[in-house]
Amino acid sequence: NFKVYEDIDNKDTLFAMDNKRRVGIGGDDKCGIFACLYMLEILPQVKVVFFSREECGCKGSTAIDKTFFADCRYLIQLDRRGSKDFIQTYWGNKTISHDFSSEIGNVKKKYKYKNQTGTVTDVMKLWNNKVGISCINLSCGYYQPHSDYEYISIKDLWHSIKFTEEIIHT
């Protein structure tokens, strides 16, 4: 009986119920997948990859053939909780080039994204495995991940999608 509901008081919020009990909505995966599928629809030049076992040590991204990214200028992962977090540093290691950072700086300011430090994620693993291009992770509108009170802000999800789209057009 798993169902997704729109909050009556805040129509921007989606949450899940199962047998009259709040449950996690799986927003960390669903928001990123939705954003990627949307990007494929409007920007046919983008490449999308979905990795398996990200939450079990990023096994899928660790095993990928790096030549898949040979024609890519950068990697954008939409798998960060909240809104407006721009992850380009993991444990003191930057995963973004100075040139790419300068190139998208005005777009980042326009959308009010702020640098934050990230934790283990696929783009961090790819950077560590010397994929050779800038790798960032962006907030995409889910909150309280992996809990029964997880929810999605539709407004924040669309904000991250528009930010990503503008980065791609830059």
Role assignments for model-derived ranges:
Residues 1-15:
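Acidic/His- and Gly-rich active-site-bordering loop/insert found
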Residues 13-23:
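A gly/proline- and charged-residue-enriched helix-loop-helix capping module
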Residues 144-170:
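His/Asp/Glu-rich mid-to-C-terminal helical/loop segments that flank catalytic regions of hydrolases
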Residues 85-86, 124-127, 144-149:
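Short active-site-adjacent structural elements
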Residues 21-99, 111-115, 122-124:
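Acidic/histidine-rich catalytic neighborhood of metal-dependent amide-processing enzymes
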Residues 117-135:
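Short glycine-rich, acidic/polar surface loops and turns
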Residues 96-108, 156-164:
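Gly/Ser/Thr-rich active-site loops/lids in small-molecule metabolic enzymes
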